A protein has these predicted regions:
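Active-site donor-binding loop signature of nucleotide-sugar glycosyltransferases
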Residues: 38, 139, 178
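Structured loop/turn residues at beta-strand edges in well-structured enzyme cores
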Residues: 80, 98, 129, 168-171
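Structural beta-sheet core signal
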Residues: 1, 87, 134-138, 175
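Residues at the starts of beta-strands that form the adenosine-phosphate
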Residues: 32, 133, 172
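N-terminal beta1-alpha1-beta2 submodule of the flavodoxin-like/Rossmannoid cofactor-binding fold
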Residues: 1-104, 109-112, 197-215
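Glycine-rich phosphate/pyrophosphate-binding loop and the adjoining helix
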Residues: 146-215
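Short, glycine-/small-residue-rich phosphate/pyrophosphate-handling segment
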Residues: 116-164
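Short, acidic Gly/Pro/Ser/Thr-rich loop/turn segments
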Residues: 8, 43, 142-144, 183
Length: 215
C-alpha cells in the first residue's frame, strides 16, 4: 500500500486505507504485504543525474549511477511483486501531492516498467507489467469531482492516477472517495459511510482471488 498523507495527523484517506487492509486481511490470504508511507518518507525527486543514469546502459552504469537509481530499483521491485496496489492520498490543490508524483516518477522508467517502439506509430509507449488491480482511496475538502459533478473540471487527482496506472501494470481499477471534509456536516458523515461500504464491496470482489500480494 502507498500512503501519502500528512504524517502529523491521522488523515481520512489513511483511516480508510487501514480499514480496507484490515478487512482484506480477514477475508483473503495475503502472501506478502508491503506498506510505504511516502508522506513520512518522501521519494527523491528525479534530477538530470537520475535521467542520465536511466539512459545509460545497465552494464555501463557507474557505481554512482547505480546508487542514484537504487531507490527507483527498490520501488520497481516492490511493484513487480504486487497483485493489488492500494494508493491512499488527499487531494492537494485539486491534484496529486508532490510526494506521490515523485513515487510515480521513480517507478515509470523506460525498459523497466515501459518500453518505447516507434513501430507502434503515434503511441510508441507500452507497459511491461500487467494483471494488477489498483484501489484508489482519496479524500477532499470539497465535493462533486466525479464525472458530471460540479467540480469535475477541477478533478486532477484521480484522472492523473488513472493515466499513470497503466505503467504500473494495472488492468482493473476501483475508486473510493471521501468528500465534504471542510464542510464538516452530515454530508461528510454520509460520504465517509458510503466510502466504507464501497471498500467492503471491493474487498468482497478481491477476496474471490483467495490469495494476493498487496503493495
Amino acid at each position: 500500500m502507498v500512503s501519502n498523507d500528512n504524517p502529523d495527523h491521522d488523515s481520512i484517506s489513511k483511516k480508510l486505507a487501514r480499514r480496507f487492509i484490515s478487512e482484506l486481511k480477514k477475508q483473503t490470504h495475503i502472501d506478502e504485504y508491503m506498506y510505504r508511507d511516502i508522506g513520512v518518507n518522501p521519494p527523491q525527486f528525479i534530477t538530470q543525474d537520475w535521467i542520465g543514469a536511466v539512459f545509460t546502459a545497465k552494464a555501463k552504469r557507474t557505481a554512482q549511477q547505480q546508487q542514484i537509481l537504487a531507490q527507483s530499483d527498490m520501488y520497481i521491485a516492490e511493484l513487480a511483486k504486487a497483485d493489488v496496489i492500494a494508493i491512499s492520498s488527499p487531494m492537494y490543490n485539486y491534484g496529486m501531492p508532490a510526494q506521490l508524483k515523485a513515487w510515480f516518477d521513480q517507478i515509470i522508467r523506460i525498459n523497466e516498467t515501459f518500453d518505447f517502439d516507434l513501430a507502434r506509430g503515434d503511441k510508441p509507449l507500452a507497459p511491461l507489467m500487467s494483471g494488477k488491480t489498483l484501489v484508489i482511496i482519496t479524500s477532499s475538502g470539497e465535493f462533486g469531482f466525479e464525472k458530471g459533478g460540479i467540480n469535475e473540471a477541477h478533478s486532477h487527482l484521480v484522472p492523473h492516477l488513472r493515466t499513470l496506472s497503466k505503467y504500473l501494470g494495472v488492468d482493473q481499477t476501483f475508486e473510493v472517495a471521501s468528500e465534504y471534509q471542510e464542510f464538516a456536516d452530515e454530508r461528510h458523515t454520509n460520504s465517509m459511510n458510503m466510502a466504507e461500504q464501497k471498500l467492503s464491496a471491493i474487498v468482497s470482489v478481491l477476496s474471490e482471488k483467495k490469495s494476493v500480494n498487496l503493495n
